[in-house]
Amino acid sequence: VMVGVSGGKDSVALTIGLAELRKYIGFDFTVQAVTLDPQFGGKPMDYTVLQELFARYGIPYEIRRTEIGPVVFDYRKEKNPCALCAKLRRGALHTAAQELGCNKVALGHHLDDAVETFYMNLWREGRIGCFSPVTYLSRRELTLIRPMLLATEQEVIGAVHAEGLPIVKSVCPADGVTVREQTKEFVRERCRTDHAFRQKTLHALQESGIDGWRPVHTGRGSFSITNEEE
């Protein structure tokens, strides 16, 4: 399982969580951490704290320097950079997984991410949609998994603080001023007046017919596995 590690709380928590899960799950698997350094401003980021953390847990870790930052902000000068950045990162992550011999790519999305994506698709594109918990990429022969989808952002933050996990602060020029950040604030406001807002949205996702979201009773988990080509 290759984990795409940005350095933020979600991907760091996911990496350590998967490494620790091997002790209890009943079958073994390998965890490989990979960071794609976008090199915003043409400068490499310092990921020393992550190198030290993953070394303590015995997790192989690779940093790949990319030109994603300069391409998005300097060459293309995107007014809405997130879509292009995400597309470039996806391609680079999938390539890294294949080159490293991994058949699964784990992403650190949590419940808040899913809720925000649901409303962003509704408002911006007028459609009911969200990423799937599990997605099979037939052309790449890779499976994307999102193991933390039922955890809230606050639960992830709590785990990071409890374990004292280090994070690398984002230096993206668009950080905090994106449409997602506006949607995140909407969700926060709704949750202040309706504490069940996230769970209600999760129920809507599960009843929406979106691939992979309808729960099934397996005895161990609630998500069905969907094969969806991307």
Which residues are covered by each model-predicted region?
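Short, basic, helix/turn surface patches
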Residues: A86-A97, V134-R139, V187, C191-E207
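The feature marks non-catalytic terminal segments
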Residues: L165-E230
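Catalytic subdomain that performs nucleotidyl-dependent activation
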Residues: T30, D112-E189
